Amino acid sequence: MKSSFSINSSRLFKRFFGKNYQAGVELCFQIIKSSLNLSFDPEFALLIVSCSKMKKLNKQFLKRRGCTDVISLCYNETETGFSLAIGEIFLCPKYIFKKAKEIGCNNWFLLTRCLIHGILHLFEFNHEESEAFESVTMFFQDAIHEEILSVWKF
């Protein structure tokens, strides 16, 4: 069974993954699901936002200033009852692509990494809690990213 997700901006993902962009996002998610040994198929929303929208989200939910690459909002059980809906991921491609240029890497390489990072946050991998959590989160993020890059060439 496939996970259920919705994407608000298919044009960007068509450029990234080609005509079958949903298969690309599904591939990312299935590799993460396999890596985490999940036995269920959660639902999530993937939203592409502008820098101005991301600034507002960053201030509203994280109490931080400025734009950022990815924000994940987890639904907690009291909000949704028993549900497979786990949350929403907001990506800001303009910020991600600017950052990619600054560090000298491929736009799509960094976008994939941010997508993985966002999905891991939905599973409560929180690198900001402690150094140990950061090590575990980055280990999973690197391993999953490497596996995706070995399967999906861009």
UniProtKB/Swiss-Prot annotation:
One Pfam family named in its UniProt record: YbeY
Origin superkingdom: Bacteria
EC number(s) recorded for this UniProt protein: 3.1.-.-
Null allele phenotype: Probably essential, it was not disrupted in a global transposon mutagenesis study.
Known cofactor(s): Zn(2+)
Subcellular location: Cytoplasm
Cofactor, how bound (note): Binds 1 zinc ion.
Keywords noted in UniProt: Cytoplasm, Endonuclease, Hydrolase, Metal-binding, Nuclease, Ribosome biogenesis, rRNA processing, Zinc
GO BP annotations listed: rRNA processing
GO molecular function: metalloendopeptidase activity; RNA endonuclease activity; zinc ion binding
Keyword Iron-sulfur set for record: no
InterPro entries (UniProt xref): MetalPrtase_cat_dom_sf_prd, YbeY
EC class name: hydrolase
CC terms in the record's Gene Ontology section: cytoplasm
Function recorded in the entry: Single strand-specific metallo-endoribonuclease involved in late-stage 70S ribosome quality control and in maturation of the 3' terminus of the 16S rRNA.
Family under the similarity heading: Belongs to the endoribonuclease YbeY family.
Protein known as: Endoribonuclease YbeY
Organism: Mycoplasma genitalium (strain ATCC 33530 / DSM 19775 / NCTC 10195 / G37)
Gene from which the chain derives: ybeY
